[in-house]
């Protein structure tokens, strides 16, 4: 980055070209690119991203850990299979919704699993009823 306080970049845009450009640009450098868009995790790892910041891992960490291990082992077929699983998990709360609607649903899923309470901070509102 060139700035001592910026040590990595997390890209959560749903833009394959953007994460590909970032991951390839910084591959092999000491400036990690982290993928934040779950639908692009598998691709981002192929392109050189060095980590994931997955919302779905808050309630289902296992497929993300398996994906990371598969990617570091070069098992891209397993990565593709895991990407499908992760995308289905992601649909439970995101499914094209804006962040202001998907975050309360994520919290509700986590609350159902006993991981946290369902409350969110303003200006967001707690999820109610079917999504």
State each model region's role.
Residues 60, 79, 83, 99-103, ...:
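Generic structural signal for well-ordered, non-membrane alpha-helical segments
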Residues 120-130:
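Short, flexible active-site recognition loops that position polar ligands and cofactors
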Residues 1-90, 94:
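Catalytic alpha/beta core domains of metabolic enzymes, predominantly
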Residues 41, 45-49, 88-122:
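Conserved short secondary-structure transition element at the edge of the structured enzyme core
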